């Protein structure tokens, strides 16, 4: 009897150990920090990572959204950073929910390159919440398009997924007419040349003459892609082009 009990206890211990091991092996991990994700509430990212995303707060450049020095006294309605004062941009206003680093960078990377499309919903809703002033008064949001070859390779356009979470209509008013090198592989000086003449309007843009629209994308680095899109839209008659992105590389 004692031997039978010992064997039974040993079998139970082995089973419990196996269950524990399986739970560790197969339990989902946070896409941003790899912590065990036992109770996911906002996609495959833990709540700690979501709450660690620090918003970009004023004072911000009204044109590109870069942080301005906190000591600067702004006495004019349009507060622009030195770069935006030197450069003629087609984008009227741009905002991002946070800097492209830490958990936010990991979340965007997981969405964009690892195919974690379920992240688009919570990330898009965070954009909608923190970018409410960009959406107010706009006729629609326009996702930055991928070239058909890249969309076919990736299987989706993350900008379209994010745009669907906005509280106003999504209009596909742009198309990418030329395949371009990935912007992440290029130095800042070449990014504007890389996307020059890469976009064209679709028939849907005809209904947007005189309107205010908001471009939606995942990341803004130098703003070259957003600016190229804005120029095409304004040439087609759009009055004001804003941009809302999930993240921004600050100081580029």
Language-model regions, residue ranges each:
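Conserved PRPP/pyrophosphate-binding segment of the phosphoribosyltransferase/PRPP-pathway fold
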Residues: 66-67, 71, 76-215, 222-252
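N-terminal juxtadomain amphipathic helix
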Residues: 2-101
